[in-house]
């Protein structure tokens, strides 16, 4: 079809421009979500740099991104699926498998994203949700080759600790507001 021939005919330079446009949108969305120490250079998370610095984030910013994403029910449905099959516009079938093995290792995991680069090591961010609590785990540099399973073990330890040690507490109930006159104040 015309759509697939368009994609086949994109030059290397055009591809670079499209990646730049996409990562600019990713950086803008990260800022909107509340991330302050993230800079995307590649859409796939691979190590790279540009005139604004290296491709980087923090565990905190990953947790902010995951917290933002899980507000979208479609995002949760997609990311908690173990596999998915679809067709392109020409009717060719594809199947993808979710690399997030933790989905089947720990109850109530609603989303997660794995990652690995030589510089970053194994990284993982996931969201846990039960009837009362939601927890986000973000792990960076959680082992290098031969230690691929560390991210699962560490996620389990952190989630077990959170589930057993944190309860929702109401700090203020029936809050009353008052109008207070401030002399020489400005609004």
What does each of the following model-derived ranges do?
Residues 1-67:
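Mid-domain, small-residue-enriched loop/turn segments at the edges of structured enzyme/sensor domains
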Residues 35-36, 53-187:
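Domain-terminus/edge residues, biased toward the C-terminal soluble/receptor-binding domains
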């Amino acid at each position: 079809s015309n759509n697939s021939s368009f994609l086949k005919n994109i030059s290397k330079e055009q591809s670079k421009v499209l990646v730049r446009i996409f990562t600019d949108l990713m950086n803008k969305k990260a800022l909107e979500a509340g991330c302050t120490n993230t800079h995307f250079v590649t859409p796939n998370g691979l190590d790279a740099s540009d005139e604004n610095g290296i491709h980087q984030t923090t565990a905190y910013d990953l947790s902010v991104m995951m917290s933002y994403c899980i507000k979208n029910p479609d995002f949760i449905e997609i990311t908690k699926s173990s596999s998915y099959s679809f067709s392109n516009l020409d009717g060719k079938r594809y199947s993808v498998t979710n690399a997030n093995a933790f989905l089947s290792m720990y109850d109530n995991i609603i989303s997660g994203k794995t990652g690995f680069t030589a510089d970053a090591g194994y990284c993982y961010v996931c969201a846990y949700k039960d009837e009362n609590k939601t927890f986000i785990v973000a792990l960076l540099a959680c082992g290098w080759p031969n230690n691929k399973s560390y991210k699962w073990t560490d996620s389990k330890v952190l989630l077990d600790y959170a589930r057993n040690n944190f309860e929702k507490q109401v700090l203020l109930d029936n809050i009353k507001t008052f109008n207070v006159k401030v002399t020489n104040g400005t609004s």
